[in-house]
Design a protein with these regions (language model features):
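PLP-dependent aminotransferase-like
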Residues: 89-147
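Active-site pre-lysine segment of PLP-dependent enzymes
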Residues: 111, 129-141, 153-177, 181-214
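PLP-dependent aminotransferase class I/II
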Residues: 32-34, 55, 204-289
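N-terminal "arm"/small-domain region of PLP-dependent enzymes with the aminotransferase-like
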Residues: 1-50, 141
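Short beta-strands and strand-loop turn motifs
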Residues: 119-121, 144-151, 177-181, 289-290
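PLP-dependent enzyme catalytic core of the Aspartate aminotransferase-like
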Residues: 161, 310-311, 320-351
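Conserved PLP-binding catalytic core of the aspartate aminotransferase-like
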Residues: 270-271, 281-312
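Short loop-beta-helix segment that forms the pyridoxal 5′-phosphate
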Residues: 52, 64-86
Length: 351
């Protein structure tokens, strides 16, 4: 059987148990696909007999307005993961630096091009927050550095000043700084934390973003990246297949950018439910790393995940994250009733 790295394997659960689970393993919007996006996909169906625009011109124009950046600084892909792999193929670095734990696809993409991946282990005693020592690890010879903002699975967020210093260290070493902001838009004050202001002064910076999480579009597959390095974006474009983003995904993205009321509802829900879920988990004796994201990292018995699966609830086991072990789990923050079911099921399991 093929081993899957990530959460969200609803089909695997259905095959095993013959039913669907309440899935907390995928960090997507608990409100589902916005109606306006679903309508846009339906409206785009008559164009399915045509090849999609390989340059995503309409979508990039909409993103240009939304992000306040020239369309020439935007590249779209089949999810952020697609673009992460394209970056590895474009740069072909020999040596890279990532944190541990962090999103697995950075190392996976880098290793496909023979890159040596150095992992900076984050301190559990410090709730896995990234520290100044990480900057000291950015040395000549390191050709690319990945920083996840907020980090997955810890939810920890480095300050804009820290990201600036990381960018400066990378520039001094001739390294690319790749900042993953795929979960940043869940924060009401995400604009305060983004690395976008650095794009105006740093050719070595690239930022990854995605529609997947905030808009509940995981199955549509749509992401994009931002960079002032036109040559790098062109290399990345050439490293991927020409029609990576379907017509339906492009239409969905344009529609999603108009869903400001939906985004406000998602942010309000997470802001209201996350403290309640955190309190409930801690009341059950579980250690919780709260972070700033729409998910929580928690620690409990190594048998916890399997026991919950038997009862129809799925967490993201974190044993395959370097820097964590089988006692760590990640849970999304979902709706009030869903979070209550999680807490009730945990209480049954933990006694």
């Amino acid at each position: 059987m093929q081993t899957l790295t990530h959460g969200g394997d609803w089909m695997g659960y259905r095959e095993q148990f013959g039913r669907d689970a309440l899935d907390f393993s995928a960090n997507v919007s608990p409100l589902g696909l916005p109606k306006g996006v679903a309508d846009a996909i339906t409206a785009a169906l008559p164009q399915a007999d045509r090849y999609p625009d390989p340059l995503c011109r309409t979508l990039r124009a909409a993103l240009s307005e939304a992000e306040g950046l020239p369309a020439e600084q935007i590249l779209c892909g089949n999810g952020a993961a697609d673009l992460i792999f394209r970056l590895a193929l474009a740069v072909k670095p020999r040596r890279a630096l990532v944190t541990a734990p962090t999103f697995a696809e950075y190392a996976t993409a880098l290793e496909t091009v023979g890159c040596t991946v150095e992992r900076f282990t984050l301190n559990e005693a410090n709730d896995f927050a990234v520290t100044e020592e990480f900057l000291d690890a950015i040395v000549p010879g390191v050709e690319i550095v990945f920083l996840c903002q907020p980090n997955n699975p810890t939810g920890q967020l480095a300050s804009p000043a820290f990201v600036r210093r990381a960018a400066e260290r990378c520039a001094a070493c001739g390294a690319v700084l790749a900042v993953d902001e795929c979960f940043l838009d869940f924060l009401p004050d995400g604009d305060r934390w983004t690395a976008k202001p650095l794009l105006h002064e740093d050719q070595n910076l690239i930022i990854f973003k995605a529609f997947t999480k905030l808009y509940g579009m995981a199955g549509v597959r749509l992401g994009y990246c931002l960079s002032a390095d036109a040559a790098l974006l062109e290399k990345m474009r050439n490293a991927g297949q020409p029609w990576a983003v379907s017509s339906l995904a492009q239409a969905a993205g344009v529609a999603a950018l108009k869903e400001t009321a939906y985004v406000a509802r998602v942010r309000a829900l997470i802001a209201a439910q996350k403290p309640k879920l955190t309190t409930g988990l801690r009341a059950l004796g579980l250690r919780v790393i709260e972070g700033r994201a729409n998910y929580l990292l928690l620690q409990g018995p190594e048998t916890l995940g399997g026991q919950l699966r038997q009862k129809g609830v799925v967490l993201r086991g974190c044993a395959n994250y370097p820097g964590l072990d089988a006692s760590w789990y990640r849970t999304a923050v979902r709706t009030g009733p869903e979070n209550e079911r999680l807490l009730k099921t945990l209480q049954e399991v933990l006694g």
